[in-house]
Amino acid sequence: MKRLESSRLNVIFNENNGLSVITDNKTKTEWRQFYPIPPADATVWDCNLSDSTIWETDFSQSGDGLKGIFEEEPFKLNMKRNFPIPGISIFPGNYEVCIESEKPNSLSIAADVEYYTTILNRTGEFLLKTVPLNFKKTGFGYSARLYSDDMDDCTDAFILNMSFSANPKTEFSVKKVYLKHCTTECDPVSIKEVREENNSVLFTLTSGKTQSVQCRISVEDDTVIYELEADESEPFRERLTYPPMPHTGGELNWIVPKDSGLRLSACDIKHEANFKIPFGEFYVVPGLNMAFLGADAAEAGGCMMIVDTPLCARVGYTVANAGGTPSYLPHLQFFGDKGIWAQNRKVRFKFLENGNYVEMAKQYRKIAFEKGFLDTFLEKEKRDETFKKSVGTHRIDSGMDYRDMPKLCDALYKAGTKNVLLKFTASRNNGAYLNGTELFEDGILKEYSERYSDITLYEYENTRDLYLSAGEFALDKEYADFAKDYRVKSIKGKYLCGWVDIMGNAAYILCPHFAKKYLDFRLKRYPLKDYPYKARLFDILATTSLTEGECYDTAHECSRLETAEIRKEILDYARKNYRLDVHTEGTAEYLIPYCNTFEGSLSIMNYPGISHMQDRYEMDFNCRIPFWQLVYHDCASTYFHWEHGDLTHPTIPYDDALVMLYGERGMFLPFYSFDPLNTGLIDRMTDRIKTLNIVLERVKYDSMEEHSFLTPDGAVQRTRFSSGVTVTANLEKNKSYQIEGRLIEPWSVLVEQDGEIIFKTENESGGNIK
C-alpha cells in the first residue's frame, strides 16, 4: 500500500490492482474505487415483459410474463423497436441469458446477440459482430451463455434478438427474461513498477495486452489528480478503463451532464433510465456535453470527476460490484486518435462537503471559467454585435406552404412576438420542398426584407452529409461534384456513410477540412444581399462523434483532435467573415464562446420517447435536473429538439412548463398538412410565445442560482434566477399539490419576482394555481 495526504484527504493506493481508498477528513466519508465488473450472479438487465413495444406478438402481456397459445407464427423479441442503438450497456465479461418458463419443454428458441461500440470504429461501423446463441433447457426454463472471448475490448452494448416458436395450439408461459453476470477473469488494467516520488505515486499502467502508459497520482487539498503519459505517436488501439469513479458503497445519485442534466439513482438497477441511457463520448449527443461526472452522497458529501482531456474519452455506464452491492457505475475510458495515443490525459477528483447538484454546478462554473467556456451573452455581445441577434429568441422551423409565409409573419407582428428565428427554406410548394432560388424568384424574400426585417431568418448548414443520388431531396449535382473529393475515407480506404434519409438514401460523410469550402460555396450561390438569412444553424455539428472526423484520405487527412478545432473554426469563420449569427444542433460546452444556442438538449436525446410521436415522456421528471442551466444559463441557451415543435401534440403544456421552469426558449414547427393558419394553430403558437416571454424576457441574461424539488416525487420544482425571478412548475399530468398554501394543479406554472406574482397558469389545458 502507498499513502498520499493533503490537508483534507488521505489516499491509500493498492499497488496490486491500482485502486484507491480516499478518506475525506472533513465529511469523514470513505470513498472507494471499483472497476465496472458486476457481482457474480448479479442481474444486469431485466426485460420488461409488459413493454409491448419490444415484442412482435399479440399474446397477453403483463408484469407477470407472457401467456398464450401458439398459432402458426412465432413471436419475437425485437429490442430495436424501443431501445436506442447501441442498446443495453455492458462491460466485457461472461454472462448468461436466462428465460424462466413454466412450460420449458414447449418452446423452440432461435436467437443471436449483436455487440456494439458507441464510438464509430475505424472501418466506419457501430456494429462489431453478431453471435448466435445456443439455448439449453434448465430447471427454470432456458439459458444461453455470452462469452468474453466473443466480445471485443471496445464492446459497449448489446441487443438481443429472439424468436420463440412451438407446435400450433401449444400453450406457453414466459415469466422472465434477464441477463446475469457469471464471471470476469481479470481487472481491465494491470499495474507494475510502483514507486513514490515527491509526494506522488508513479506506476506503469497496462490496458489489454500491450497498451502501456505511465501514471502519476498526486493530491492537493480537496483534489486527487491522475496524469497519464506516453509518447504521442505511440500506437494505442484499445480502451484504457482508468481511473475509476469513486463510490461510497452505499446509496448515492450520479449527476450526469447528459443534455440538460440527469440525476440517476446508482443502486436502482431496475430503473428504466439506468439501462436505457447511453453515455458514450464527450461532446456528442449520445454522450455528455460537459467533461464532468458527479456523485451525490447527500450528507456524506460529494465527488466530482473533472476530465481535463475529454476529446479522446467516453463514459460507460454498467452494473458493477460496489463493495458487494450491485450498483450502476460510470466508468471513464480513454482511447486513441487514429490509432495513436495522441495526447497525455488528466483527470481530477474533487471532493465536496455538500454533494448536492446545485453546489456541484457552482463548483463546475468556476472550472468552466478556468477553461474559458464561461463566456456570457453580455461578454460575447461586447466582443461582437452579431451575438445580439438571437438572445431571447424562439425558433420557428416552418414547414408551411411558402405562399402562407407572409401571413405567418403578419401574425407574429400582430401578436407582438417578433423575437423569433424563422426558417423559410423548409417551406413547401403543394407539399414539396422548395429550393432556395424558388423563394428568391417568387419575390417572397424581397417582400420579407421590406416588411418583416425585425424577424431574423435562419438557414440550416450541414457541412457533413453529401448525397450523390436523389432521395428525400433532389440531387444537387453541382454541389455533389464540388464536394465528392472530400468524402471521409476509413483506414481500409472505404468511403464512410452516415445519415440515411426517409427514402433509404445514405449520405456520405464529408471531411471536416471541407467545412470552410462548403460555407464559401453556399454563400456564393446564395449571397446575403438576395438571401437575407442572417443566422445559421449548423446541423448535426455537435450531435456527431469526433471519430467521424478521422479521415485517412492523404489529400485531406484529419483526426479527432483536429475535428474539435475545426468545429470552433467554422463557427468563428461564419461569424467573422460573413457576420452571421451561428447556432448548432447538439450541445457542447467548448463551443459556447462561438455561438449562443444549441438545439435539442432540452430533450433527452437518443432515448426512446424524445417526442410525443413515441407516446411517452422522454424521461421521468424526478430524474431530470437543469445542470446545464445552473452552469451556463447566462452563456448559451438550449431548447427542445425539432420533434417537439409539432403544434398539435398533447403534451404541449408539459413542454411549456419545463421551458419556463428552465428559463429557456420555445421550439415551433408549423406544418402545412395541419393548415395552421385556418385551424387556429398559429394563434395558439403566438399565445404560447407571449406566455414563454413572461419568463424569457426577464431572465435571458440571468444566471440560474437555484433549483429544488418541492415534492418527494419530484413533480413540483422551482428555479430562481439572478434577477430575482422564481418559477414554480407542476410537471405532473394528473395530480395537484398543495405548495406553501397554494393548490398547484397539473401542468401549471407560477412566476414571481421579488415576492410578487407576475404570472400564473389559468387555462383549461394547463391546469390552474389557486
Where are these regions (language model features)?
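Secreted extracellular polysaccharide-interacting domains
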Residues: 70-90, 118-122
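Acidic/aromatic-lined carbohydrate-recognition and catalytic surfaces
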Residues: 422-483, 488, 574-575, 579-582
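Extra-cytoplasmic beta-strand recognition segments
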Residues: 47-49, 57-59, 81-109, 144-145, ...
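Short beta-strand-plus-loop segments that form exposed binding edges in beta-rich domains
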Residues: 160-169
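Carbohydrate-recognition beta-sandwich/jelly-roll modules
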Residues: 3-51, 66-68, 79, 110-118, ...
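Active-site-proximal substrate-binding groove within the catalytic cores of carbohydrate-active enzymes
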Residues: 5-7, 11-43, 293-302, 309-360, ...
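Asparagine-centered strand-capping/turn motif at beta-strand->loop junctions
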Residues: 101, 166, 230-232, 729-732
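Extracellular carbohydrate recognition and processing domains
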Residues: 118-154
